[in-house]
Design a protein with these regions (language model features):
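Secretory targeting and sorting signals
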Residues: 2-50
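Substrate-binding/charge-relay-adjacent region of secreted/lumenal peptidase catalytic domains
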Residues: 50-285, 289-311, 333-387, 393, ...
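Short acidic, Gly/Pro-enriched loop/turn segments at secondary-structure junctions
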Residues: 315-321
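Signature tryptophan residues that serve as conserved aromatic anchors
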Residues: 323-324, 454
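Phosphate-binding P-loop/Walker A region and its immediate neighborhood
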Residues: 329
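An often Trp-containing, charged/polar helix-loop segment at the C-terminal end
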Residues: 397, 404-453
Length: 469
């Protein structure tokens, strides 16, 4: 029996956030297909462009039809991998989707070398400068503890020729949500199984931030794992404290790839204050369940002081489109995100509308991720492919830190002030597989369908250079 099936049974019984409200069952588990290639944008070689952070790129495999890694890259480039592979949610509450060996399978796709997009591919797609110089700190807030975090990050960065980033040099720092040492990892039982799953999310977050800003410092902050019906306010309170810890430690940007139910406790008072820090960019995933169909977006992407990051499908050939599962919606507890124009909030009856901006999130065009933490199954994932808006949020946080123009940042305000030339407008795609905009009076179609200008799936578009940041 596949030992991972026992772990996924936990997922199917837990409650997941769908459109900012809890739903049980498989609604949050996306049976989509995915895969990608490190060299997808520049050809069939593993990496063709110069490293964004300097160093030598290691090609994982020679170009040849018989090599399975090369074949994955070619299939992704052609968009045909969706015919034979699937994808599933990585963990409850998080917005990551891991590619599986085949449709209907829970077993993650394993590759002997990077098969998803790497830093150089994404830099080319977004028109980023060849070199990264910033040493600003990107804080990543995750649940649970990953004992292999540092070594897995080192392997990822070495594979793509990025500068080393470890605890000895001070480039990588690990803290718990109150600023102390991270707790010991769970060694057995359901806790170990959950931490094994969450480790994929953690690796994705750190790898994505590294890809966006290869020279930035990284601060990984762990919050206790909570997922019960009554633990929503406990969890959001812990995440809020973690943001304060990150800011106190000097973070320039903070990324959260988790979503919780919005309620009066976390949309006001101390929690709201903790996620409002002028001069610090705070990004959050909009989720992977399409248009939310309700009056509340998932916390914390619903907050005015947070940049809500949606998702696109990013093929090697042809324009990007809005990812079909990218979260979008309204938050009626607020009139607008900071700096959000009336033309945007009109889609939600002049309330906070999401998303603000977007980046690659489709697991079909997802990121190369390296993760070996397997305390429960004993079966490391190694190289795999992961998408979801958990990929786009830390990437955008990395761009904020890399650009360094943060003094006026509060929520997405500076993005809306930037010229249109700083973005690639995404004009195709819809996220109505779960709910349709037409079924909700007062909701405009732009919340569900990508088109010219702002839309719910992709916000004002995906980055074109660093000018907007």
């Amino acid at each position: 029996m596949d030992r991972r099936r026992g772990r996924t049974a936990l997922r199917r019984g837990v409650r997941a956030v769908v459109g900012g409200r809890r739903a049980t069952g498989g609604a949050a588990v996306l049976l989509v297909v995915s895969a990608l290639l490190t060299g997808a944008l520049s050809g069939t070689q593993a990496v063709a462009a110069a490293p964004a952070g300097g160093g030598t790129v290691r090609t994982a495999a020679a170009d040849g039809g018989g090599d399975p890694v090369v074949r994955l890259r070619q299939e992704v480039r052609a968009g045909s991998l969706l015919d034979t592979h699937g994808a599933r949610a990585v963990c409850p509450r998080c917005a990551a989707q891991i590619v599986t060996e085949k449709k209907g399978s829970d077993t993650p796709l394993h590759a002997s070398a990077p098969a998803g997009y790497g830093p150089q591919d994404l830099a080319k797609a977004y028109g980023l400068p060849a070199k990264s110089k910033s040493t600003a700190t990107v804080a990543i807030i995750d649940a649970g503890v990953d004992a292999n975090l540092a070594s897995d990050l080192a392997a990822y960065r070495a594979a793509f020729g990025l500068p080393a980033c470890d605890t000895a040099s001070g480039c990588l720092t690990l803290k718990n949500y109150t600023g102390g040492k991270q707790p010991a990892p769970q060694k057995s039982g359901p806790g170990a199984a959950l931490e094994e799953d969450v480790a994929v999310e953690t690796s994705l977050d750190l790898d994505a931030a590294s890809a966006a800003c290869p020279t930035c410092h990284l601060l990984e902050i762990s919050v206790p794992w909570q997922d019960g019906e009554d633990d929503n306010d406990v969890s959001t309170g812990d995440f809020a404290k973690a943001v304060d810890t990150a800011v106190a430690a000097g973070a320039s940007a903070v990324s959260i790839s988790y979503g919780y139910t919005a309620d009066v406790t976390n949309t006001s008072g101390a929690s709201l204050k903790s996620l409002r820090h002028k001069g610090v960019a705070i990004t959050a995933s909009t989720g992977d369940s399409g248009f939310n169909g309700g009056i509340h977006q998932a916390w914390p992407s619903n907050l005015p002081s947070v940049t809500a990051v949606g998702g696109v499908t990013l093929p090697a050939d042809g324009p990007a489109t809005g990812w079909w599962a990218a979260g979008s919606g309204c938050e009626t507890d607020f009139t607008a995100a900071t700096g959000q124009p009336a033309a945007v909030t009109a889609a939600c009856g002049h309330h906070r509308a999401a998303a603000d901006v977007s980046a690659d999130a489709d697991p079909a065009t997802g990121l190369a991720v390296y993760d070996t933490y397997a305390p429960s199954s004993g079966e490391p994932v190694d190289w795999t492919i992961v998408g979801g808006t958990s990929a786009s949020a830390p990437y955008i946080a990395g761009l904020y830190a890399r650009a360094g123009h943060l003094s006026a940042v509060q929520g997405p305000n500076t993005l809306y002030q930037a010229p249109a030339s700083d973005f690639t407008d995404v004009t195709g795609g819809t996220n109505e597989d779960y709910r349709q905009c037409a079924d909700y009076p007062g909701i405009r179609a732009s919340l569900c369908t990508a088109g010219p200008g702002w839309d719910g799936l992709t916000g004002i578009g995906m980055p074109h250079g660093l000018g907007a940041f």
